[in-house]
Amino acid sequence: MALPCTSMSLVRCREHLLSLQLRCRGLRQRIVQADPETTIACWCTPSDLEDPQKPALLLIHGFGGSSTWQWGKQIKSLRKHFRLFLPDLVFFGKSFTVSQHRSEIFQAEMIASAMEAMGIKSYNVLGISYGGFVAFRLAHIFQERVEKVVIVSSGICMSPRDMEELLARGNVKKVPELFVPETHAAVKDLLRLSFVKPPPLLCSFIIDDVIQNMYGTHRKELKELLEALQKREDEEALPTLPQKVLIIWGDQDGVFPLNLAHQLKKHLGENANLAVIEHASHAVHLEKPVEFTEIVLKFFLHDGV
């Protein structure tokens, strides 16, 4: 039998280890038919092993890989209090569609459909970065299903000027060049903007591995997701949300600066609170996992910040 880490891909080896970690935490991956054209892969606890009285919590990842990559430091603490659902967004991990829809609204609709197919009628939601855009739309469209919302490091209120400044910080001309990197320089710039202390300088073969195995499979479609997101921001007025919302941000976010968190809070009004974590950047849940998780639990369990 072939090993899961063949062809000397450190990315694939790491992904395999992270999958084992999730399994050790009691999660299993399901493939759910969201609609006739779309399948959603989702890590969750088997229903026969979980207390049905626990509230459900949906965790929506960003562009830094599938759900397998992003929540390892939160699972142990969150699983004590929630039935967890970690879906892969469409074109990430094992989720796929033949549909031509690319908007964050489509992503939200597919996640909602997958949750319904799994028998989950109501849930809390937490989304980070691109996942925060999806969580926002999910909470707006499916208000009767979504209870509380946490949005992390998501530039939902970006203006054209904010976009220009992001491109300048990332040394790119278009957004997909930064978030779907194809060059060594782009990978390094993305890490620089995402972490206060970026990982040590990577060897060339590791960067090549990241480019190929984290972004190579659906590169065209991933770029289209970002283009659709940017187009919708330019065309539509942003709705508000009726749910209680917690906004979490790193004070040194290099992707979406802290002023965007304050703008989002102002837009959402009295329903929203903001928690700023010091000495953290865009990947705040990875840089400050203990503080981040404590804030999340306090909000979901006690309405605190």
Predicted feature residues:
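Catalytic active-site module of serine/aspartate enzymes centered on a nucleophile-bearing elbow/loop
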Residues: 270-305
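Conserved alpha/beta-hydrolase catalytic His-Asp/Glu region
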Residues: 160-168, 178-242
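Conserved acidic catalytic loop of the alpha/beta-hydrolase fold
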Residues: 105-123
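Short beta-strand/loop motif that positions the catalytic acidic residue
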Residues: 241-242, 247-249, 253
